[in-house]
Amino acid sequence: MTVKSTILYFTFALLISQLTGCGGGGGSEQNNNSNVSNNASNQNSTSVQNNADNNNSQGGDSNTDNSGDSSGDQGDADQGGSNQGGSDQDNGDQSDSTQSDETFSSKQQVSRFIQQATFGATPTQIVSLHEKSASDWLKAQMEQPASLVLPSVVAAAPDDPDDGFNLFHIEQTSLAFWRNSIAGEDQLRQRVAFALSELLVVSNAGGEVLTDIPEAVAAYQDILIQNAFGNYRHILELVTYSPAMGHYLTYMGSEKGNEQTGRMPDENYARELLQLFTLGIVALNKDGSVKLNSEGAPVELYNNTDITGLARVFTGLNLNEDDPEELINTRFTKPMQIFPESHSEKEKVFLGLTIPAGTGAKASITQALDHIFNHANLAPFVSKQLIQRLVTSNPSPEYTSRVVNAFESGSFELPDGSSVGSSGRGDLAATFAAILFDEEARTQAAENGGKIREPILRFTHWARAFNVENIEPKYIPQLWETGATADLGQHPYRSPSVFNYFRPGYKAPGSKSAELGLVAPELQITNASSIPGYINFMTYFVMGQQQEADVDELKEEFDEIGVEFDLQEALQSFRPNYDPLLEIADSPTELVAYLDLLLCAQQLSDQTKQNITTALSKIPSDEDDGFLPRVHLAILMVMSSPDYLVQK
């Protein structure tokens, strides 16, 4: 048996021995006791819930969220970050407040917080932030300049726009994402923007326009990145005028109705704006629970008449035509333009608001967004989903209420006594601070808490944890498309529909978590194919096979499109640094303890640690590589264990 096959054998053996009947899209149930609700003995966690429903689910499911199924069409399918290492700034010596911030009082607490707030903790962060001020770290992160996507896309565009298909240009939205998420100094901003992207979904997965014109999605990504700590109302405005969203949800070019021809305004954006981006479909209490009428049934917020009225608001928007000579790629980066002759002059009635007949497009959009933004459902609907993306899948009503208070007041007091937020409703700086510093996020949580780590976050965590060198994803073809279940099973900004990869209210069929009434959104993309796919994907990188790849074919592709190819950079790209692990690898116990803190914030159960330690002891020092095979196995077993896959 080769070293690689031995490592894979032990990794699969551990996973199979611990994996429970979590269910998932098409996966078979397995009978053991480690899942979302019970994956490690006496471990802490928090939870999240959600209410946007996905009608593009995998396998049978039970739907308990607040978004239902869409009855309309789903649409067609500064500089970038440094490429050297992760963001390790401690920013811990700036506090002038009198209150003590104990959030980072232990390395375990640092690791856990940073895993929730970024794309993964680094060894340097865990050491340097220990006993520093988490409040100062958060405020410093909010001041970090934004690492943007569009500049990279524009720089990669062919000199002659008529040159045709250019894969390197098209893939820049993905390459910039990987670079920024792993190496960006603005880690909190990047992580928050990714969370927002899973709520306000635009995808270039379907090919055609949003694939061929990457500037569109890049500009959309930058909206979320630049406004990650801004106001949700402002984001709704920018999203509404975004050509990427306009094309994706098919209201770009929507015209006023014509009774003679039977033409009606496109209703797609109106429906998803209410259902997925702002309110859901049933009334919510402040704590995120569903309001019931006198008969015990959920209270529906609107009907199709409301959608029809709101759809009139978004007529008359199309690509900017101020400069007829401007390239279409550039026009897709600018807000859509209003064409008054195409805008509906009719009265627009929805959700109790009447916009008088004859009101222009700009005023109609402003009034409509203001009315939706001030609706009582918006704060709990949005807040609960953002908790879910960062901390936990099933937050308590009290946790949700506290975050809703921060969203509505626009202010949050940090542990050091200082405040963040503009004191305006919808302030996201206050909202995300409330999510991360809440007592439920920071203290030992219920056994049923936690969230499944998304595949994207697992990979970025590995890259940051082991300080990969030369972060140039352009040299790693595997990162150009990771959405297949044979790979990660998820790719940034390429969800299969406007409902994201998974629904916030998803309950895995046949799972113990579902029996307990718990949602587990990420399990919707967990199945019999995705589990070995993830392990194989990580094995490639963990074992350094990217440094052994035959780059001749890749060089030919670069030469064909006229992109400079650096052989040494290609061979060194994403090379991990395992030196700290090799220094202690002669002791399996020390090795597991190191990885437990770095990757799991000391959440590995005693049984898991024992299983891994036993397996590692059977991997001797290699004549050529020393204990490197043992290090490889240790990382793979930890990152494949349910104790890691469930972020507590």
Question: Which ranges hold each PLM region?
Answer:
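Bacterial Sec-dependent N-terminal signal peptides
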Residues: S17-D69, D88-D101
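Long, intrinsically disordered low-complexity tandem-repeat segments
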Residues: Q74-Q89, Q94
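N-terminal mature-domain "stem" immediately C-terminal to a signal peptide or N-terminal signal-anchor/transmembrane
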Residues: Q99-S147
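Active-site substrate-binding loop specific to GH73 endo-beta-N-acetylglucosaminidase modules
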Residues: S106, I126, H130-S133, A140-M142, ...
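Flexible, low-complexity segments enriched for small/polar residues
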Residues: S111-T118, L200, H375-A379, S383-S423, ...
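Amphipathic interfacial helices
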Residues: Q172-T173, A183-R191
